[in-house]
Amino acid sequence: MSDEVSTIFYKPFKDAKPYKDDTGIDYKPFYLPYYLLNLEEWLAFLMASDRAQKPFWDKVLQMTYKFYSIFNCEQKNDKKCEFEFINYFKWKILGIIDLILSQLESDTAKITAARGIAGRCLNIINALSKNEELIKFISEISSRCGLIYGNNNSELQDFTNEQRTNIDEDLAWKIEEIKLTHGNYYDYKFLNTAVEMVLLEEEARGNARIREFTSTMLTRLDFFLNNNECRFMRESEQKYDNTSTYLREMFHIGANEQNNQLITIDSSEVGTDVLELMTSVVSRMIYDYRKEKIGPDRRQQPVHLLLDEAHRYIRKDAQYILRENIFEKIAREGRKYSLFLVVSSQRPSELSDTVLSQCANFIVHRIQNEVDLKYVYAILPYFSEDFITKIKQSVPGEALIFGNCVPMPLQVQVIQAKPDPNSKNCNVEEEWFRQQ
C-alpha cells in the first residue's frame, strides 16, 4: 500500500484508489468513513484539548448515536419507536429545566434561562423531526415562563412536576444507556444537533462559558460537515460493519484473493492536517489488524506501507495533530506483526529520527543539498567521503544501496520503469520559443 501525494504514477499504477471521484481518470474512489475514527482521532482532527474537551466530544458522539438510533427507528413508522423517541426527549428536556430551576436563585434568572432553553430545544426538534407532540410540549413550557412582578409563582416547577408523572423513566434510562462503541455506524448529520443538546445540558449545570471553550473545536466541526476536502470522509458507497470489513473491502487486506497486491492512494489534493489524519487512521487500522493476528497467521500476508514524500507524515521535531505518530510506532514495533515501512523522501534531514533509526536498508539517489548529505553521512554506518562524492556525481537512475540487504554498499543502475511515471522535466527553452 502506498500513500502517494501526487498523480505522477497513474500510468504504472492504474488500480490506484484516490479519495476523489471526479478526476476524469479510471480511478476507484477512496473513502475513509468518519465513524471508524476513534475518540482520540476525532479530538486530533477537531484540534481539541485532551483534558477539557475530550469529555464534551465523547458526550456529543454518544448523543449522536442515540439520535441516530431512535430517529432511524422512528423513520420506519414504528409506533413503539415513535413513543420511545418522544418519551426520551421529554425526559431530557425536563431534566435540563430541572437543572436550571435548582441551579439559579431568582425567578427572573430561572425563567429567562428556561425560556432560552425552550427556544433552543424547539430548534433541535425542528431539525430532527418536527414532531407535533414535542413541539406542543415545548410550547407549553414556554407559555409557563411568565413573570408577574419578577415572580413565576412556581408555575414552571408545577408543570414540570406534573409532566414527570407521564414520563416512563425506565424506558428513558434504557435509551440513555445506549452506548456507542468504536466502529458502530452513526449519521454525521446528527452531529450539530447533538452538539447543541450537550451544550444546553452543560449550560444548565452552570458551565456558562462552555460555548467559548469549545468554539475552535466547533469551527473545525463545521469544516468537516461543509468542506469538500472532507467529502471522502462523509460520503461512502457502503456502510462498513467494522475496521476489518473496511480493510477487506477497500484494500483487500485479509481477503483470500490476491488480485490487489499494490494499492496507491492519491492524496495530492488534501491539506496537511487532513492528510495526516487520513494516513494515520488508515495505518492505525492496519496496525491494529495485524496486531490481532496470532501464531503462524502473524507471518502470513505481510503488509508494506510505502510513504512517498514522507516528510509530510513523519517530520522531525514536529507537533503532530495526533499525540503519538503511528508511523513511528510501526517503525518500532511493526516488524513483530509483519507490518513494514518503506520511506521515500527528497529531504532526509526533515524526517523523524525515530523512523530512520529503525530503517535497516537505504537506497540513496542523487543528493545535492549539503544539509541532507551531512544527515545521511551521520545516520548510515560505513558511509565515507567517497560515497558522498558518488552521490553528488550520480546521474538520474543511479543509486547507492546500504544495509542488511547487501553484504557491502553497492552503486547500481535502476532499471527504467515501463511505462514511465508522468514525471518528466519540462524543456523550458523549447517551450519558451514554441510557435503556436
Q: Language model features by range: what are they?
A:
Residues 2-5, 257-260, 299-301, 336-338, ...:
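Short, well-ordered loop/turn elements at secondary-structure boundaries
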Residues 127, 131-134, 140, 396-436:
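Conserved P-loop NTPase motor module
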Residues 280-283, 360, 416-418:
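Short, solvent-exposed amphipathic alpha-helical segments in soluble enzyme
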